[in-house]
Amino acid sequence: MYSRIPVNLPQNSYEIAIASGSLSRLGAEMSTLNLGKKVLLVSNPEIYDYYGEIAVNSLKTAGFEVATHLIPEGEIYKTLDSITQIYDTAVENFLERSSTMIALGGGVVGDMTGFAAATWLRGISFVQVPTSLLAMIDAAIGGKTGVNHPKGKNLIGAFHQPRLVLIDPQVLKTLPPREFRAGMAEVIKYGVIWDANLFSQLEAAKKLDEFSDLDEDLLQTIITRSCQAKADVVSKDEKEAGLRAILNYGHTIGHGIESLTGYSQIIHGEGVAIGMVAAGTIAVKLQLWSEQEANRQDALIKKAGLPTEVPPNVNIEAIIEALQTDKKVKAGKVRFILPQQIGTVTITDQVTSDVIREVLAQIQSKA
């Protein structure tokens, strides 16, 4: 059964369609959008081996002409060089302004495909078909696209909304367990910043750290509620003028830790998990919420099999320095998203370097 969530924007509204087995109906879903017949499917080799044939057959059955472009897996390939290679394939296949790029993969594939679509011929349509939990509930929704710069994550990018986000939860069965757990960090984030009922549902679940632990109904509920939270926020603040910044809860310190560990020792969701622990601890110190609520959050993060400590090999001063290149810096001040209670957060630039330093030392692994 489909769950359909509208993302209502002043222009370029679209739908998130969620259903088991929906990948085989990709072509039929796209046929309703009045798109040109030429499409470029962008994926990575592993995902394409699993799901490329299903997607391509569905598109061809619906009358689309399909070209493909595969990019290596990993955050280290999220660069302008990789974007140029997508452009090369677009040239070779005569992609026009009426053509569409399709992202079949995780957040890296989605970010890069969206950025290529945003900039090819000054902007063509694209469709998100996320295959990781993290991409399904976060990266694929909201139109943020881009690549990394050697000095920081996602510093080069554009807002470019997809025409459709198609989510098939069953593709998660081939997702590596570590990647599934990384996605759960973003689910927990929505519970803390927006949806206290989702948080309670996660607390009530017996286990959260593996795909096989969740029955189909619970998985569909988690994905749907998370997507609804993201859609609600994006609909109210498309270009991150204010409210949308709350979606970066846990990301401020998390991004710094990711980049300092080469995007591999600590991957995105793990960085967010550590960042949420840090933000929750800062919020206790600033008396924004209680230690009891911070403990509930941290217990849920542990239940999802996620790290809660800064790795011992990461230099705290280097994290503080990395915060200065964060996208949320305004007038030289780092803006933090801090919880006030489960389901509600606030944005502040009043967190001093001394407090950050103290909290990071407190939550750094001593091993």
Curated annotation (Swiss-Prot):
GO biological process: amino acid biosynthetic process; aromatic amino acid family biosynthetic process; chorismate biosynthetic process
Protein name: 3-dehydroquinate synthase
Signal peptide as annotated in the record: none
SUPFAM superfamilies recorded: Dehydroquinate synthase-like (SSF56796)
Reactions that this protein is recorded to catalyse: 7-phospho-2-dehydro-3-deoxy-D-arabino-heptonate = 3-dehydroquinate + phosphate
UniProt EC number: 4.2.3.4
Underlying gene: aroB
EC main group: lyase
Disulfide-linked positions: none
Annotated binding of Zn(2+), by residue: 186, 251, 268
HAMAP family noted in UniProt: DHQ_synthase
PANTHER family assigned: 3-DEHYDROQUINATE SYNTHASE, 3-DEHYDROQUINATE SYNTHASE, CHLOROPLASTIC
Organism this protein belongs to: Gloeothece citriformis (strain PCC 7424) (Cyanothece sp. (strain PCC 7424))
GO cellular component, one term: cytoplasm
Record note on cofactor: Binds 1 divalent metal cation per subunit. Can use either Co(2+) or Zn(2+).
Family: Belongs to the sugar phosphate cyclases superfamily. Dehydroquinate synthase family.
Primary site of residence: cytoplasm
Keyword Transcription regulation set for record: no
Superkingdom assignment: Bacteria
Cofactor: Co(2+); Zn(2+); NAD(+)
Location(s) in or outside the cell: Cytoplasm
Binding site for NAD(+): 73-78, 107-111, 131-132, 144, 153
Statement: the UniProt record of this protein carries the keyword Cytoplasm: yes
Protein task: Catalyzes the conversion of 3-deoxy-D-arabino-heptulosonate 7-phosphate (DAHP) to dehydroquinate (DHQ).
Annotated GO MF terms: 3-dehydroquinate synthase activity; metal ion binding; nucleotide binding
Listed pathway(s): Metabolic intermediate biosynthesis; chorismate biosynthesis; chorismate from D-erythrose 4-phosphate and phosphoenolpyruvate: step 2/7
This protein's UniProt keywords: Amino-acid biosynthesis, Aromatic amino acid biosynthesis, Cobalt, Cytoplasm, Lyase, Metal-binding, NAD, Nucleotide-binding, Zinc
